[in-house]
Amino acid sequence: MRNTITTLTLCLLAVPAFAKPKNEVVVPLKTGTGEDAGTATFQQEKGKLSIKLNLKNLPVGEHAVHIHAKALCEAPDFKTAAAHFNPENKQHGKLNPMGHHAGDLPQNVTIGEGHTGQATFKVDYLSLDPASPNSIIANGGTAIVVHEKPDDMKTDPSGNSGDRIACGVITT
């Protein structure tokens, strides 16, 4: 009887853990040579998705960061991540009057002389909720990609942002 009560209690305690949607995902990024490029932390908070980048071992300068459609990051070029995450079939760029890809983040990230950089974005057009049409974790997930150049925020399809230099798979 005691074992039955203990088992039932443990089961009841486990139910909320399974029922609660994931509100944070930490993604490690790698360079094309397999070097640690830092992390991206995604946190769902009050209808917005916070994306916190803590990057390292990247070239000094401005770099575009995008969410790409496939949860694949095969080095060295990361082309397996496919095109930008774009469930609404829009064009590229925050400055595009017709709207932008869901994978377009609102600004570039600066990598300083120490080859590190941090940035935080809050967006209302991406979600960790797997039931959301703009979920970055549904259907197997997506990828976060750092590019060699800054995004000009208007040129379709990728803002003239150049090659992909770091990548991380976004899944739960």
Regions found by a protein language model. Name each.
Residues 1-4:
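Positively charged n-region of N-terminal signal peptides that target proteins for export
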